[in-house]
């Protein structure tokens, strides 16, 4: 018996180590795919002897005299001013009650049944009540501010720009990631080549991190299992 117990200790230690290693479940990123884009090389212009070459390589290296320099091609950069401030609240309540009472008795009892049902011995009365009262509420608010420079990775058919970008900040033993993607209307871009995040359609903003501090904030899958299984 002692021999089997000695063999059981390594197995138990291996199981504990396995459960500990699988304690952290990685979350699916909100912004997926590449977070940058490279400019598409244009065709080499053919010199026609004129000062102005109409075959400019998709505006690269060409700046109109009376026009602001704004992103319009794949690979151009744009600054997103993060100004997110969202709050929501919800409350609900419900109550219901019901009472009931029933009585049963004999007004007249035959003489030969007086011993059993006489003097209100057969009278019955039942009553019941049921009540319910429930309340619920939820509050949520988030604030996000900052700046992030993104890259145009797609020019849509109507001229809108799909942008995507990422910023990484390494602090001690962890790394913070700020990812952004969305669709920008070129008309909303200011002269400083920036646009508020509130004017970006289909915006995806993600602020996550990795490292032991981030792992300590996540509940293990075994804890989640018992949390969902427990009736308390």
From Swiss-Prot:
UniProt keyword annotations, A-Z: Bacterial flagellum, Cell outer membrane, Lipoprotein, Membrane, Palmitate, Signal
Protein name, UniProt field: Flagellar L-ring protein
Description of how the protein assembles with itself and partners: The basal body constitutes a major portion of the flagellar organelle and consists of four rings (L,P,S, and M) mounted on a central rod.
Chief location bin: membrane
Cellular compartments annotated: Cell outer membrane; Bacterial flagellum basal body
Lipidation residue positions, type N-palmitoyl cysteine: 22
UniProt key word Repeat: no
Function: Assembles around the rod to form the L-ring and probably protects the motor/basal body from shearing forces during rotation.
InterPro entries referenced in this protein's UniProt entry, alphabetically: Flag_Lring
Signal peptide: 1-21
Domain of life, source organism: Bacteria
Origin organism lineage: Bacteria, Pseudomonadati, Pseudomonadota, Gammaproteobacteria, Enterobacterales
Family from the record: Belongs to the FlgH family.
GO-annotated biological processes: bacterial-type flagellum-dependent cell motility
GO molecular function: cytoskeletal motor activity
Lipidation (S-diacylglycerol cysteine): 22
Gene of this entry: flgH
